[in-house]
Amino acid sequence: APIAFDELKRVPALEKDCEFYWGENWRNIISPTDACKNYVKRVKKINAKFLVGHHYTRYLGDLSGGQILKNIANKSMNLNGEGLAFYEFEGIPNPGNFKNRYRTALDNLPITWSDGELIINEANYAFKLNMDVFDEIGSSRPFPLLATMRGLLQLTWGAIRSKK
């Protein structure tokens, strides 16, 4: 797929962060929240070509706002760079240039105008589903930033696990 850049592969980084936050037995400890389950259900339900909207929301979000979240978490939680591997894109030295490359690949996808509109709608819905996860995590935990970081890891791991 034209937007399946190797630089975006996150599973090893995700596993490293999960081990940092939950320990070696993390696979038996964490489970998806209701909002995460709804997100995964949506991803499984839609036509594969509309996953582009989720891909765009996830990765451009991680390369933009995710970098801000990473820096805030690192400073406010004194993480010294640990537990943040998910937000490290070692193969992307210049996120701005990469995002331009990604957008060019999107612009060149062989899709119809109407599919493009549906992909945009799905990207907006993916953003809403992400916000549902944040709302659920924030309302149930005393440390919102840590809960958000951990919740993103749970969401992502839940989505990866559901594809296997």
Question: Where would I find each of the regions flagged by the language model?
Answer:
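Metal- and O2-centered redox machinery and metal/ROS homeostasis
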Residues: A1-K164
